[in-house]
């Protein structure tokens, strides 16, 4: 058995690792995993009374075992203190959003004043578009992926209409080349250059929800900024999955959800990033509400709105404390594990999945049933692999579910598999591939 030394594993340098298609190898890898203890911090779902192989953290992350404790803390303060919990609770609700800034800043590569936890993803995207899509003169257009998550497209389409413009004329889509599924970065950058005088905004997901492709946001932002074009990023499938450096990359704004890789529960609270150059500009147009007002004068009930400095100035209503309590439980785990360590494990875990599917199942472009459409390059993917089915895809997915696999089906023909480094193991990956092999 060709296992790396412990120090080698901690760097996850799988280029020099010889994978093996055995349960013993997978278990030995798990034994050497420095992050293995975190699996015990989550509840594992069951199917038919048996623990499932859960590979669906890209759709809904698992529940941290500390969620109940965090919720009970807030329920106890509500029960015992009533309205006084805003000032005298264990974590006073009046300042609740401040308790998340440090953790979220680390996950997004931001300054603490550049991030705030609030609302839901598409709500926040609409709030950001109000401020950052400012069509003027020739610059009226928005550049997007052709196959972006539909909710983002709905938001953009309606924002364009709010400005009295035609979405068919103002939305420029970047398409894969003929015969390809994913985008080439040179094509994205060329599209920005081609339309540099027409673009008011570049809006992209950091990781595509369908293919699992990770984009080079640094290069995209540099090209946009070179031409004075605003750039916004949807981090739904990136935050908690890959390291980010939004401030250094000079991204203008970003938003995300917390119920996927951040494991904060169904409908979990979202958040936004607003770069300091905008957060310190009180004149920037925005939709406003009392929770975004200067904290020092919020309860003076003045009519004039004075926004807080930073991303907090985009808040509208007070914090949803119970939802955010669940969010805190997960962020505490991320603080302990560290996103860079998680990424290193993830690269190896997903590489092992890729290798097993190819070597044990023969999955490739010429396979009669399955093909992996996620890029082979680790720099162009997070933990997700997307398996495109060529025939009877939903039937295969249902068979996997019946065999104890919880994965994700996306129309029209993709099974999404996401081995999450916080709670998935090499044994999970090995057993999953054995089930796939038995059904092909």
Language-model regions, residue ranges each:
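Polybasic, lysine-rich low-complexity intrinsically disordered segments
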Residues: 6-7
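Pyridoxal 5′-phosphate
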Residues: 11-440
């Amino acid at each position: 058995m060709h296992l790396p030394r412990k120090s080698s594993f901690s760097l996850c340098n799988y280029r020099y690792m010889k994978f093996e298609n055995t349960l013993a190898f997978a278990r030995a890898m798990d034994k050497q995993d420095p992050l293995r203890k975190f699996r015990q911090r989550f509840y594992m779902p069951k199917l038919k009374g048996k623990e499932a192989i859960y590979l669906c953290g890209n759709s809904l992350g698992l529940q941290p075992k500390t969620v109940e404790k965090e919720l009970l803390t807030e329920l106890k303060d509500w029960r015992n203190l009533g309205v006084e919990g805003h000032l005298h609770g264990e974590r006073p609700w009046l300042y609740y959003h401040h308790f998340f800034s440090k953790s979220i800043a680390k996950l997004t590569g931001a300054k603490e004043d550049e991030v705030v936890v609030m609302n839901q993803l598409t709500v926040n995207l609409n709030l950001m578009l109000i401020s950052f899509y400012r069509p003027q003169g020739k610059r009226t257009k928005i550049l997007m992926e052709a196959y972006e998550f539909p909710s983002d497209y709905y938001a953009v389409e309606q924002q364009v209409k709010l400005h009295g413009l035609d979405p068919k004329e103002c939305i420029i889509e970047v398409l894969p080349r003929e015969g390809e599924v994913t985008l080439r970065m040179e094509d994205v950058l060329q599209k920005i250059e081609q339309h540099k005088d027409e673009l008011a905004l570049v809006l992209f997901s950091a990781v595509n929800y369908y293919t699992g492709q990770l984009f080079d946001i640094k290069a995209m932002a540099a090209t946009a900024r070179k031409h004075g074009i605003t750039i916004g990023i949807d981090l739904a499938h990136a935050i908690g999955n890959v390291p980010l450096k939004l401030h250094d990359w000079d991204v203008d704004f970003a938003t995300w959800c917390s119920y996927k890789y951040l494991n904060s529960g169904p409908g979990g609270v979202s958040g936004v990033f607003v770069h300091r150059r905008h957060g310190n500009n009180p004149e920037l147009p925005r939709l406003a509400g009392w929770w975004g007002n200067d904290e020092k004068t919020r309860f003076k009930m003045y009519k004039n709105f004075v926004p807080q400095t930073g991303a907090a100035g985009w808040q509208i209503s007070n914090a949803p404390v119970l939802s955010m309590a669940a969010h805190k439980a997960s962020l505490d785990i991320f603080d302990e594990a560290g996103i860079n360590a998680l990424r290193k494990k993830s690269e190896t875990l997903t590489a092992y999945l890729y290798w097993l599917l190819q070597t044990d199942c023969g999955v490739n472009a010429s396979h009669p049933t399955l093909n992996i459409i996620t890029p082979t390059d680790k720099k162009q993917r997070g933990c997700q692999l997307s398996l495109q089915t060529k025939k009877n895809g939903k039937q295969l997915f249902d068979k996997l579910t019946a065999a104890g696999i919880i994965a994700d089906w996306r129309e029209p023909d993709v099974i999404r598999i996401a081995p999450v480094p916080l709670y998935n193991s090499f044994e999970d990956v090995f057993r999953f591939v054995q089930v796939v092999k038995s059904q092909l």
